[in-house]
Amino acid sequence: MMKKFAKWLEVLLMICLMLTACTPASQQPTGNSEAQVENLAKLCKVWGYVKYTHPVFLLGEKDWDEELLKLIPAVSEADSDEVNRILHEWFLSLGEIDYGMATSISTLQEDKLCVQADISWIKDIAYLGKDLSEDIQLLGPIPSIYRENAPVKFTANPMGTRVTDFSNEALYENMDYGDQGYRLLGLFRLWNAMEYYYPYLDILDNNWHDLLPEYIARMLEGKNQESYELTIASLSAKLQDAHVALYNSKYTILEAGIYGVPVKIMQAEGEIVVTEVLEDDCPLQRGDIIRELDGKNIRDILAERMEYFSVTTEKKFINKIGHFLLRSNDKNIELTISRDGIEQTVSVEGEMAYYSMLETAEQPYQILNGNIGLLNPAALQAGSLSSLMNKLMSTNGLVIDLRQYPSNYVVYDLAEYLVDGVKPFLICAVPTESNPGAFLKNIKYSGKQENANVERYEKPVVVLMNEKTQSQAEYTIMSIRNGENVTVMGENSVGSDGDVAYLPLPGGMNLSFSSQGIYTSDGGQTQRVGLAPDIEVHPTIEGIKAGRDELMEAAVDYILSQNEN
């Protein structure tokens, strides 16, 4: 009987929506009142919560995007008092809450949960009305179901850790950028995916819920591809996550500029400094301090870039947007620099290329002066660590350069040589299947197993890191710094770790973001704050100018001093 009623109600709702939405969303009146924005924000929240919890969507029986596109014009033009009725009738039209051949719900231990989503609003009768509030609360925890056709499913990475999968989301590569429906669909998809599957909402500078009405208004005001892409980019930048990147976004790239200055840069003594010149005809030199680009202060340009490119903090931008900073849409780029204390302007021919700020290495290992070994994770070949460590066993000390990004996963294998016994090194919070917005914490261990046929490296070990150390490099440091003879040296790391998930977005774009929470073994924060070195060492402008690697020098000196004691 309930299914027949739901079917009848769905037909009735369709008629109502057709009557209230007889004009396309793109032709709706353009005056965006505060009430309209509030109504659309409510629609976003209700649709998103239902999308990730109702069996009709989780089992792939209805198209969640199609349902939203039908609702947008009706809700957009409705009086505030009507919105709750429209949403409640829509909710009832979805049918019974029946998960089919589902298994029982796993009980989650409260002390292992990290809850990010704020769903207190579903119990707010004043906000939703009594009927909608009571009915939407029936969606409760989700049993284990077949999610192959769901808006979100879960796979496992090579280490067996759960990873969020949004591959069932449609890209709409040929969308009409003037259609308010599809513009809002992109915004609502992004907002809800982060609300329920981004593990760090609690440490953002902005409240995620407060941002929603602001970006709805921005999306309604725009009419073209540029405004759509930049609105999406701007909201994603608010995640303050160095894993965030918006792929296949034409106007985000144009905002930075298509021509780049062929150099590498870093921060030293509070300045943005050239560390390497990559083209012979480039007039810049190592040690040049960047002051202006095309007549604009470089710090002002940095602030403009951070509107659309996500960084963990204002101070940690090199690894993420360093290659977007010195760019222009003019091929001839004017740079004002300071060289030897004298300011001058030079003209640089820009290149249509992107220059990575990451450190690289050609050889997987070297023997430095004093018989000190150097391990370059960026050049490690798969399966080669064992033979390399055998060659390095006779050295008087070891430097592991994790200013580089590891080319292969050596988190646990490397720890077996450096950490005596198995020890906890971090807590990983992964999304739960039963409770969208909740993450389950698991302790990760590393070190030498009792029966492992691995010789422990006994000499002093220095691990180098800096403002470019991110993600797997940070994970590796956390795994090995428990070693008795291991010292971490250099600068604070970026603070973006854990597996990356990808969210398809209308317009053919994809958004990457950190999908797991990574904490220290005692539960401390790592995201945004990064890892702190045991010994701080910073590069100097004079050192850069002279071509010195001051962090490497400090590492070698430290090992030599330890061997003298």
Feature locations, PLM:
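Amphipathic alpha-helical substructures
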Residues: V56-H88, Y198-H243
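Conserved PDZ fold ligand-binding element
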Residues: V46, V50-H54, I72, L190, ...
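Bacterial N-terminal signal peptides that target proteins for export
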Residues: M2-L9
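Cleft-lining beta-strand/loop regions that shape enzyme active-site pockets
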Residues: A35, V50-K51, L59-D63, P73-S76, ...
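PDZ/PDZ-like domain segments forming the peptide/carboxylate-binding groove
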Residues: A35-Q36, C44, G48, K112-M159, ...
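Bacterial lipoprotein signal-peptidase II cleavage site
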Residues: T23-Q28
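C-terminal motif of bacterial Sec signal peptides marking the signal peptidase cleavage site
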Residues: L19-A21
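PDZ-domain C-terminal substructure recognizer with occasional recognition of PDZ-binding tails
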Residues: D81-I97, M101, E221-L246, M306-M357
